[in-house]
Amino acid sequence: QEDVRAAVAYLADSGIRHIDLAGYSFGAWVNALAVNDGLKIDNMIMVSPPVAFIDFTSIANLGNLKLIVTGSRDDIAPAGMVEKMYPTWNPAAKFEVIQGADHFYGGYEGKLEAALMDFIASKCSS
């Protein structure tokens, strides 16, 4: 969390007014903990939050969580587990499952990129 907080503070001190976070696997958990503990950001993306491996039960009410992506074959971030948990994080967040992808998205990088870029483009145009 200290690294995330330091990076966000650096950006804010540099005059960046809108700060978004994206984290993959362990990074999704670290970002969620920091935001859950009060770190102020605008939007957050979680890619394959490792709910089968790390306890996410203390994380709730992440109003800035906008997108969660996982793969249908991800055994570290199983779609069914993530789908049950994300309403406690933010029921308004978009939940996307990439069919056939495992935790590492091998062969599905283009689909992951498309999901992320579609979301980012929608935020940039609004």
Where do the PLM segments sit?
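Alpha/beta-hydrolase active-site loop
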Residues: 1-14
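Gly/Ala-rich beta-loop-alpha elbow adjacent to hydrolase catalytic centers
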Residues: 23-31
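A conserved short beta-strand
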Residues: 40-51
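Short beta-strand/loop motif that positions the catalytic acidic residue
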Residues: 62-63, 67-70, 74
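Short alpha-helix in the alpha/beta-hydrolase fold that links the catalytic acid
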Residues: 64, 78-86
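Acidic catalytic loop of the alpha/beta-hydrolase fold
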Residues: 72-77, 103-104
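Catalytic histidine neighborhood in serine/cysteine hydrolases
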Residues: 88-104
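Catalytic histidine-centered segment of alpha/beta-hydrolase-like enzymes
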Residues: 101-113
